[in-house]
């Protein structure tokens, strides 16, 4: 089901949040309890949903459809999707309703669908920035794709909000773009999340 977006202005970017019908949270479905099974009561972390196999760096793409296709492929190859074609269609339908280029060279496409098996993220940095019809008009070089199962209650919005919070910091985004390996990319995120948890 495509989501309808609303915008919340922040100091650096206009962050796209989806309404409550399009969010994923950790209550209710088995997917929602994926971290409870590990006895983990800490707040959700981006690194819980992102692994090196779903990070691609300095990718060369012609447009946002190619970037989304590449990220869907990573989700599919790592067993996160029931139907990659259906999920990609869902993401593109959501994109047609309003750009997920949130500003500052960042885009957060997303889709909630029964084509998704488990909540997951994929991420890419681009060798050359692409036009994304972003809210601030800036071309995009950093993308995160959020995948949510249809039955996952509000996880979608939680992940959007968490990503938006982290990506508001220009230096953080620059560190991600400069990462030379997927492991380094994830380490940048983990370091930032650990710093916030320690506050």
How would you describe each model-predicted region?
Residues 19, 23-199:
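Cytosolic covalent-transfer regions centered on His/Cys nucleophiles
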Residues 11-21:
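Cationic, amphipathic, low-complexity segments that mediate targeting or membrane/lipid association
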């Amino acid at each position: 089901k495509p989501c309808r977006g609303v915008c919340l202005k922040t100091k650096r970017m206009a962050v796209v949040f989806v309404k409550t019908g399009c969010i994923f949270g950790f209550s209710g479905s088995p997917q929602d309890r994926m971290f409870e099974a590990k006895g983990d009561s800490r707040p959700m972390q981006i690194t819980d949903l992102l692994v090196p196999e779903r990070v691609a760096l300095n990718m060369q793409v012609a447009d946002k459809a190619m970037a989304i296709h590449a990220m869907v492929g990573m989700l599919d190859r790592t067993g996160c999707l029931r139907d990659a074609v259906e999920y990609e269609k869902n993401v593109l339908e959501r994109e047609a309703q309003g750009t997920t280029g949130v500003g500052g060279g960042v885009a957060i496409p997303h889709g909630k669908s029964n084509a998704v098996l488990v909540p997951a993220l994929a991420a890419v940095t681009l060798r050359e920035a692409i036009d994304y019809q972003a809210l601030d008009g800036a071309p995009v070089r950093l993308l995160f794709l959020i995948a949510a199962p249809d039955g996952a209650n509000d996880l979608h919005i939680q992940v959007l909000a968490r990503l938006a919070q982290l990506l508001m910091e220009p230096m953080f985004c620059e560190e991600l773009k400069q990462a030379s390996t997927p492991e380094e990319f994830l380490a940048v995120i983990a370091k930032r999340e650990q710093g916030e948890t320690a506050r």
